[in-house]
Structures are given as structure tokens and as C-alpha cells.
Amino acid sequence: MSSLQILQGTFRLSDTKTLQLPQLTLNAGDSWAFVGSNGSGKSALARALAGELPLLKGERQSQFSHITRLSFEQLQKLVSDEWQRNNTDMLGPGEDDTGRTTAEIIQDEVKDAPRCMQLAQQFGITALLDRRFKYLSTGETRKTLLCQALMSEPDLLILDEPFDGLDVASRQQLAERLASLHQSGITLVLVLNRFDEIPEFVQFAGVLADCTLAETGAKEELLQQALVAQLAHSEQLEGVQLPEPDEPSARHALPANEPRIVLNNGVVSYNDRPILNNLSWQVNPGEHWQIVGPNGAGKSTLLSLVTGDHPQGYSNDLTLFGRRRGSGETIWDIKKHIGYVSSSLHLDYRVSTTVRNVILSGYFDSIGIYQAVSDRQQKLVQQWLDILGIDKRTADAPFHSLSWGQQRLALIVRALVKHPTLLILDEPLQGLDPLNRQLIRRFVDVLISEGETQLLFVSHHAEDAPACITHRLEFVPDGGLYRYVLTKIY
């Protein structure tokens, strides 16, 4: 029986990036779905399975005789090439309508009219065979390319994002055709963006995060794992309404168009050694910033200025939430606008308590709960738990029984219950494995995009940023100091 096996595989993506596939076996007749967000490495996985990526370490062994990979990029190129014929000298004598027919596209590599007709019947596109390919709809072009791939009778077919750009009816129709292919004995691999795209017939599944195959297994068992189930739940949250704050947010007292942070030529030094050196930075309403740089660059020092904790804040031209530092404001005038989560807070949260109580403690800015909790606060926290996809059993389980990423996510929600003006996440991915990192990024995107809180996301690497980031402040080594690069993310 044919199979493809990868053991401790490291595949080259670029000079600085690799794809990690610890262990994977595809047997003849299997149907697999691999799910990952943009940048997770799922398209690289498709190429690795097809034997198109250099193997740096480990083993890749395949007994499949004919592997075919199809991607959305290939489809786009084919359509583009057909339209390009109008702008070239590829016109034949007397030809006034350039572009090949659907039948010609299907038989591009294998000329076999009876098989072409058989496949067209199987995919319901016989009426399109004489039509110019470039005039077909997205769903029709997808079926045409599948027919083209099947002309050569592959024994392993890899489809990269086959449902992308299709409407609900077209997705269902394509899934039914793929189920028929699977029943005919073809080994099938689907690479997908979302868990809810996995067709019912699929037997096995895997999850990619940070260019690592993080989990694999029988589909139903995998989808029931707590982390995977929570990631799948996050796909259903678009447009969700966040729970109200228990009391009106301090944000509402701020003028709508007033900058949240203004630092002009900021300087902080220790023993005459500059830590921040003439940094000018402004955070306007609606902006979400990533602050990125190596250890010792001054990121934490900048955060301590923003939170009002650094004594040299008074000697700088610094305005926080409309109040110039040193103008009579108290530390609490600043902190009422800020939610803060760091790995050190995570380590400090050592009290023995439940997940529910950790989130409730956000209403009191305490580690643990030492006062009465109102019925309204209990109801609001239940709404937050529902958004996180945490059931009652898990909510009332010990906080430290959750995965490290789930704990950190609970602390992020703890910081959000008051709907602060600014949420500061200081190295929120530190110490997390790829799947937990993906969990944090995904929920941060949801929670920030559906609310009005602004984000400061601090990390070592630009690629750590969640999708909601609009601007980046980068600390770049420059001699013995650092220079500052401010970028708008498009």
C-alpha cells in the first residue's frame, strides 16, 4: 500500500525560515484536512507533501507514483495568462477571440477527449467545454482545473484552499465532488483556512501554527481537543457584541479626536547611559500599535512611561490621555485608562482560584477576589466566558489546569472587562508553543476588532503581530544606541 511518511522534517522556506513537520503519515485512500491561518505555513505544507521544498533535516519517504498539487495561485495565473493572450502576438491567423476553451484547458497536458468528457460529466461542466475558459466563474474555473489535474490520474491529490472565493452553494457542490473522488480511491489532502470548511467525509486533520504542524489525528478526536475546539469556536465570533463594562468606561470622558499618547523627543537614561534617545511618538484614536525590538532596546522603559510608573516621565514632554505629566494628575488618572498583561503578571498570578474568578478579579484590579461580587458582574463574566468558548466545567476548574495560552487569554479578558482605553500586551506570546500562540493572536484580533479598546502589542519579532495592528514602532540597533522606525501597516 502506498504511503507518504515524514519524520522530524525540517523544510527550507527561506534563508531564515523553515517549516517543521515532526511526524506525519498519509496512507493510500486517506482523506486529510490541514487548517491554519494566513502565515501559518499551510501552503508550505502542501508544497512539502508534493516534494517541492528542500528537506534540510529528517526524512521524507513516498511510495505515491503521481502527486499533484493545485493552488489558488495556480488558478489565478492560468486565468491571467488567458487574458494576457489579448495583449500579445499569440493570435492565430484570422483569430478574433483569443483564449482557449475549457476542453483545451482540461487537456493541456493529457490529450484524451473521452476522459475529458467523463470528468466534465462528473463535475457537471459538460455545457462549458466549448466556452472560453477566461469567461468562466470562479467556481467553474476551480472545477476545470480539478478536471485538468485528474486527467493524469494522480494517486495523491493536494488541494490548497479549494473553497477560497466560492459561495455557499459552490462550496457544498465542490465538497460533494471531492467526496466522490475520495470514494473512488484517490488519496486526498485539503489545505484550508478555517475549521468550518472541513468536509464531512474527511477522516484525519492537522493544525498548523507558526510554520509548525502542531497537532494531527482523527478528525473528530482532534476537533474535541480543548485548544483546537477553542480556535474553531473563534471562527464564529465575527460581529459578536462584547459584554458591557460594569461601570461606564473612562474612555468616554476623553475627547474623540484627542491623541491618547504624545511623547516629544523622549529621553530616559540611567547613570548617563541613554535608554530612550529622542523618541517622538504619538498614538491617535483608533490606532493599534506593535512595539518591536530586541531585549534591552528600551521597550519596557517606554511602557513604564505610558503606564505612569517611570519617575522620569515628569522630566519629559509627555501627555497621556489628554493630561500633561506633572500637571497635577495622579497615577490613578492614568491607570484607569489602561489594561495591562505581561508574562510577569502571569507568573505573579499564583493564587489558587478558578478561571471564572480570574476574570472577575479584573473588576477589582486585584490578584484574587477579596470583596463581594455582584450578580451583574457574574452575568457579564459569563458572557465573556461564552465568547471564549469556555464551558462551565472549564470555567470552574482551577486556573492553572488550563494550557499556558488559555491562562494568558483569561488574563487578557481580565484586563478587558472594564473596556479600557488602552490594552497593553507585553510579550503575550512569550513561552507559548505554536498552537497557544495562534490562540492568543486569534482572540486578540476578535476582541480588539469588535470593541473600542486600542492595543499596544509588544514583541521581539514583527511577525508576532495579530492582524488588527495598524502601526509599528521598531527599535533598530544603531551603533551603541537605537533609532526608531515608525511604520503604518497597510
Swiss-Prot record:
GO terms for biological process: DNA repair. Its main location: membrane. Disruption phenotype: Not required for synthesis of the molybdenum cofactor or for the uptake of molybdate. It holds the Pfam family ABC_tran. SMART domains: AAA. It is a peripheral membrane protein. ATP 1 binds at residues 36-43. ATP 2 binds at residues 293-300. Residues 4-235, 261-489 form the ABC transporter domain. InterPro entries: AAA+_ATPase (IPR003593), ABC_transporter-like_ATP-bd (IPR003439), ECF_ABC_transporter_ATP-bd (IPR050095), P-loop_NTPase (IPR027417). It comes from the Bacteria. Keywords: ATP-binding, Cell inner membrane, Cell membrane, DNA damage, DNA repair, Membrane, Nucleotide-binding, Repeat, Transport. SUPFAM superfamilies: P-loop containing nucleoside triphosphate hydrolases (SSF52540). CDD domains: ABC_ATPase (cd00267). One of its GO terms (cellular component) is ATP-binding cassette (ABC) transporter complex. Induction: Probably part of the modE-modF operon. Signal peptide: none annotated. It is found in: Cell inner membrane. GO terms for molecular function: ATP binding; ATP hydrolysis activity; ATPase-coupled transmembrane transporter activity. Belongs to the ABC transporter superfamily. NCBIfam families: PRK10938.1. Probably not involved in the transport of molybdenum into the cell. This is ABC transporter ATP-binding protein ModF. The gene is modF.
